């Protein structure tokens, strides 16, 4: 989950989604990949979230460490992020 900096533009936020949306075609370890902006129903929520499903821990590590994924983080996410939260769990 991300909380954007106040200066983040709509174009920058849309670019994050567009760039991350390319990853399922590049990374077969991604079994499901969903993302979107908070609906604004409750105050205090994060602004945006992504959820990814993997078969196993190794799949997650492949995604996490993928150079293309890392480049998206560095180029498009880090410049506009105020706060990040994440969790990995088994179901």
Residue ranges and their predicted role:
Residues 66-69, 79:
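A short linear boundary/processing microfeature
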Residues 75-91:
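Charge-dense polyanion-binding interfaces
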Residues 24, 68-73:
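A common structural junction motif
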Residues 1-47, 55-65, 88-91:
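Short S/T/G/P-rich N-terminal loop/turn motif that feeds into the first structured element of a domain
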Residues 53-54, 80:
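Conserved catalytic core of Hanks-type protein kinase domains
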